[in-house]
């Protein structure tokens, strides 16, 4: 055999071995009598992870649409790893709530190393088992109704500054309008840094602190992290000796340094120690529980990073939908009135809260939940075929698909806040049916939900009271989700015009 033929034979043999390695497990679900979504070598059932032509949630949505009427469970593959997707709200509720013990953890924990990425590793969303349970018990009292109420005057003060900032920016606004996400991120950075740390990020000035820029980078799409999760699925042992951080090193270092300085200032200031805020609560917890500096910093950093981005996204999209729907904007304006609202009054704004919940339905912070099986259990398909799941298996809940299924939500792409009014059962009705997961559900429901809702409502009250919000032509008319960002966001950005009201 000539050298060229030998080389071609070797290459062909190597390619064949790679193909077998990538696809040999694709019969996993078929052998167990479970229907399987179409899968491809290397990319599994979700090719958009690699093509980046659209958000991967649309791959999940298509699988859901294909099987929802015939099957309650369907086999999928994350690269070459078999996973199971549920297609019924009953199973979604079972996994989140009624059988929580069997689906206790989130898949993200598999790809997170506490040494490489201590911020993410200490996030309640990522923590597992008893560590999560202990952390949840520690953090929840720091977000009590009394502490949220104590922070409300700070929120009002920041909201007044926010309105003035929008007013100044509108005077200088180009024809493309204002970037609503940037505006809202300035607000959440300012209000959360003040409420939590007692400092100002100077977000509404011409010379903001570096905190504003770093906040914008917190959840930038990290291709390195995505690629690492793909490799880890192809070859799981890599997680034992190599890991990649979701957060850029300089971003993590900045916030760690900021936290250390804030803690030092707080300890040295008797007056600041009287604030009933999250940082003082954490300092008290440190003394009580003996937390080390790294744990204290990570605890508080988690609250900051989650609050900055998630709250800003929800506020951005709520403003978008109010701008698209002038009648709903007018209803909200009528509800809030003209007088300054107390904490008790802002907590009782049913239509405003319904607008936020409807926004969370359309742009849910978690588009698909990936839960890790923690106790042996069994799921049964519509045809009666059951499959036994073992600890370590992953089950996917297609949150975005359930939120947009016309079987459960009439005209799912339309903004209809009345769905979530208490007279119609409110958000609780949909949660109990396994159809709404805006803040998650069950024991792992977002612990900062009350705080986040208060900050969003406070901002909406001041903005809607002072401006008519209009959609700038630069903003797309549909709800397509961006494929380049870690958090769900409208593709192309949200560009709005704020017209001063008399």
From Swiss-Prot:
Membrane topology summary: Peripheral membrane protein
InterPro entries named in the record: Cyt_P450 (IPR001128), Cyt_P450_CS (IPR017972), Cyt_P450_E_grp-I (IPR002401), Cyt_P450_sf (IPR036396), Insect_CytP450_Detox (IPR050476)
GO cellular component, one term: endoplasmic reticulum membrane
Keywords of the record: Endoplasmic reticulum, Heme, Iron, Membrane, Metal-binding, Microsome, Monooxygenase, Oxidoreductase
Cofactor: heme
Enzyme class: oxidoreductase
Any Pfam family: p450
Cell location: Endoplasmic reticulum membrane; Microsome membrane
Sites where the protein binds heme: 446
EC number: 1.14.-.-
Molecular function GO terms recorded: heme binding; iron ion binding; monooxygenase activity; oxidoreductase activity, acting on paired donors, with incorporation or reduction of molecular oxygen
Keyword Heme: yes
PANTHER family for the chain: CYTOCHROME P450 (PTHR24292), CYTOCHROME P450 28A5-RELATED (PTHR24292:SF84)
Function in brief: May be involved in the metabolism of insect hormones and in the breakdown of synthetic insecticides.
Similarity section: Belongs to the cytochrome P450 family.
Protein name: Probable cytochrome P450 28d1
Source taxonomy: Eukaryota, Metazoa, Ecdysozoa, Arthropoda, Hexapoda
Gene name of the encoded protein: Cyp28d1
